[in-house]
Amino acid sequence: MAMAMRLPAISRAVTEVASSPVGLRRLFCSNASRFSFLSPPARRQAEPSTNLFHSGLSKRITSERSLWNRIFSRNMGGGPRTFPGGLNKWQWKRMHEKKAREKENKLLDQEKQLYEARIRTEIRAKMWGHPDSGEKTAKLKQSHGPMSPKEHIKTLADRFMKAGADDLWNDNDGPVKKFDQGSRSCSDSIDSTPIDVRRLVSATCDSMGKHRVLDSSRRGFSSMSRFKRNESSCDEGDDVDAKKLDTLSPFSPKFSGTKEKVKSSTSVVGVIRNKGLFGRRKFRKNDSSTEEDSDEEGNEGKMIGWMDLRKTGSSASLGNHDIKLTKRVNRNVTDEELYPPLDINRVREDLSKKQSVDNVMEEKQEPHDSIYSAKRFDESCISPLTLKALSASGIVKMTRVQDATLSECLDGKDALVKAKTGTGKSMAFLLPAIETVLKAMNSGKGVHKVAPIFVLILCPTRELASQIAAEGKALLKNHDGIGVQTLIGGTRFRLDQQRLESEPCQILIATPGRLLDHIENKSGLTSRLMALKLFIVDEADLLLDLGFKRDVEKIIDCLPRQRQSLLFSATIPKEVRRVSQLVLKRDHSYIDTIGLGCVETHDKVKQSCIVAPHESHFHLVPHLLKEHINNMPDYKIIVFCSTGMVTSLMYTLLREMKLNVREIHARKPQLHRTCVSDEFKESNRLILVTSDVSARGMNYPDVTLVIQVGIPSDREQYIHRLGRTGREGKGGKGLLLIAPWERYFLDELKDLPLEPIPAPDLDSRVKHQVDQSMAKIDTSIKEAAYHAWLGYYNSVRETGRDKTTLAELANRFCHSIGLEKPPALFRRTAVKMGLKGISGIPIRK
């Protein structure tokens, strides 16, 4: 009965304390003591139930312990574990590796010191030993004598010899120069007789009473008695000739005397040296305390010199190997030999030789014919079929650029060519390209599995690539089987592939982006480019700039190294010339047809500048256009704007004002750009509003006026824009329209003949007409122009530096184009431009 009453209590206690291991232990011990009151028979009856309870309880305990371990403990597997000092295992490992390296370096230093000590001991033994004591030397070598330098070097070399390797040691290894034995007397032979103090004192007093020779010499020696770290106390280099004593007496400048006085002082010094009475000297760490005494007979006419610092190292360690035995005799050089008189005539001749090709050719030519040379195309090594095509086009004479570059390019040399705009650069590299293709096709080395591409021409814009392709096809119209293809953006990728496979393509003209797309998409173009012979980069300063540099590098990696490379541009800054080493060989030619100190623009192009408030620019441009149209019946005008959307706004405004205008910018489709470009080439009385896509290389004939609204990106871009007029030696005008806060750009153009002119007075009727036309333009075009204008001037370093001022200028531009308030920017765009939180820049929520 009692047993039945106690069992429920035990079960309740188990459930209450089963969650902790401590409670389980207490429960187990208390239940074991509770059965002690029973009699032995009853206890035996209760043992089965007790055993059952113990087994269940033990299982519960083990399960609870396993659960406890799973929750509150973890294995030593993954996860960060720290070592002493808060280091992880990699830091701990690197620390011990560093300690091991330091320990190894210490051992090597100790071994090096032991080696140097052994070498010094060996040298002393050889230099001081008796030449006749062969038995004694043999005994020392048999017992514990020092190792020779050869033996020690061979022992060190054997440490690094792998097992099984051949021993390549020979007698030629080791010291190059033999030590001169017998040059020094033995240390045992030094006179060890007692010093005659009376003789020493009398001689000292005698010399001091005369001219203090001993005092000066003693002071000179004592000044050198202490040596710096790692220096020697050897006195071998301290003996000088007595004749030089007058020049070696900084402590006694009035020292002078006869030979007898010098002899008396020398005798005293000789006594001191022979008796070893220099006293004990204090040496620092790693200093040598060895004194090498010279013989009496050989040093009678010598004495100690305190200023002879020819040697500061130990002679015992290196002997005479660290001394230059023969001194260089300084000959007396006159001022005339050092600075010869300048020959004025020779300097003038050198300067005349360095004149540019431009100035030289101008002397030979007529004054009105500025770009053509006297050389004809039929005088050069050009194929007859190409000459026939040139004659059909009316081209007979070469330009100066073609005359200077054609011979170099036809010889297969790499060249970097700088020439003015509109001087025939395209023809200068197309003719060598055609000759390269003809030579490669006639050589017929091997049979190509795929049709090879022999010439690759890179251009920055689509219009320029299309223009060069048209010129190349005109030159190849009499050649059969030679084709010119273009790879430019704005066309279908699949159509480009089909055209390359179906039509002949020995000359490929491409823009970097589309060419890289074909290379990376494994269209088979890479294998065709492996037979490339000539690589041409037109407008190299732009293609090798930061914008195209990565794409050009990837393209160059796919081209063979054995090729000819040509780089052409009207402007070549120093940075671009450094980067040009990626394309050109080291021995390339640099052909500058402009010349140092010459103006990079054409002389026949009149350049002017108008500084006017930015709010009046959209009123001034129509006024300037109408004024030029009235003065020039056969006008052809190009208006350059900063961005594509500002170009679209300017085009829409001029169209609303009933002007004959066209537009080209990057936002337009390629078909539209090609049609407008061809129309502008063939027509007159037309106005082209464009962005920088038409600034480089485009040959628009008979352009009479170029207007640049706002500052260009840099000086080079201004020159390229202006180069659209005045081509082929003709005249033209260039006008730069800037705001007052853009005056800083004029400092970059100070070497150009830019004439400032005042802004014209605007009629109120013209202003009203412009305002009415601006009000008709869609708001979306204005907002896009505002965003593009803000992004452009934010990227310009001078204007984008001060964001608050930039916001004020943007608000002025906003009001000038007819917007009541500036349109909001996306938050992400504002953050990228650094305009978040700037007053006057609204953010779209």
Swiss-Prot record:
InterPro entries: DEAD/DEAH_box_helicase_dom, Helicase_ATP-bd, Helicase_C-like, P-loop_NTPase, RNA_helicase_DEAD_Q_motif. Keywords: ATP-binding, Helicase, Hydrolase, Nucleotide-binding, RNA-binding. ATP binds at residues 419-426. Residues 624-778 form the Helicase C-terminal domain. A motif (DEAD box) lies at residues 538-541. It comes from the Eukaryota. Residues 289-298 have a biased composition (Acidic residues). Residues 406-590 form the Helicase ATP-binding domain. It holds the Pfam family Helicase_C. Residues 129-149, 282-302 are annotated as: Disordered. The Q motif is unique to and characteristic of the DEAD box family of RNA helicases and controls ATP binding and hydrolysis. This is Putative DEAD-box ATP-dependent RNA helicase 33. It comes from Arabidopsis thaliana. The lineage of its organism: Eukaryota, Viridiplantae, Streptophyta, Embryophyta, Tracheophyta.
